[in-house]
Amino acid sequence: MTATPFWSQIAAQAKADGRPFFTMAPMEAVSNTVFRQVISHAAAPDTFFSEFVYAKSITNPNTKFPVHGRLYVAAAESQKPVVQLWGNEAADFASATAELRDRGFEAVDINMGCPDGTVIKNHGGSDLIRNPQWAEDVIAAAKTSGLAVSAKTRLGYSKVAEYHDWIATLLSQDVAVLTVHLRTKQEMSKVPAHFEVVDDLIKMRDAIAPETLLQINGDVADYQAGVALAKAHPGLDGIMIGRGVFANPFAFESHPQSHDLHELLGLLNMQLDLFDDFATRYDVPRFPSLKRFFKIYARPELGATDLRNTMMDAKSTDDVRKILAAYQVKMRVTNHS
């Protein structure tokens, strides 16, 4: 079955603009509809990835890793995200991708790099690096749906040098996009990304699978850094940004501007409203999961440390709104005194 032109269209538009394409990384409890809409409002990438979705759960709601709203796409979103699937059973990927196709999704990405212990114990994520036959089987199964199939992985499990064989194996599967996080599973995010191997990855792609788009992830802070990286490494197609959005929700801004605390708190208020709307549809996520986002908006360099600390004691979104309202009144009084 012929795959959809999802990725080729994204890459072609970026190339016409003289830049790499940009995506926001799949992140657990982060890249759901709520945060995707916030980032889209601030500065959108070319496309988004969903949270991690257990492949079996899409057609079997009784699994231990249920979907719980991970596939929900709000009407306000301009496009459906790439669904990131994890697991190791080919049959699960065949049935999951067929169901996703019927729901109107165009692309799936297979997680082959997550270092989480629970995921690995259940034979997903970076466990596929140690079991390349599983990787080959799930890619082949996903392709039967006709969706665009990509994969996201790391350089290796324990050693950087593993990429010579591992990345070659994945490139041989003819995926639409191969995203490489420039660290090993063992390194997590504790060491700098291995940018020294990027040119070698490009050479491997050109030799083995010239039609596969190569995307890099790891230590790329923003749009400008991504453009510079692509210029330094001709042949690099895409840039994925993950943790960079926690340092700057405007990370995908092509022409960087200054953003004051008022604007950042406006994004937070937007996220609170979207969170409440999502909570009326699903029983997750719980309010405490929101607290990880406060540091994005109440930034120390903007004098908002006390505000952030106060919000961390909140018990609900309404509590946060009251704290923000009181803070803004205080700021107006201070500015006019």
Question: Where are these predicted regions, by residue range?
Answer:
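An active-site metal/cofactor-coordinating segment within enzyme catalytic domains
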Residues: 63-64, 74, 117-127
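Glycine-rich, positively charged N-terminal anion/phosphate-binding segment
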Residues: 2-12, 27-99
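Hydrophobic faces of well-ordered beta-strands that scaffold small-molecule active sites
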Residues: 22-25, 48-50, 81-85, 108, ...
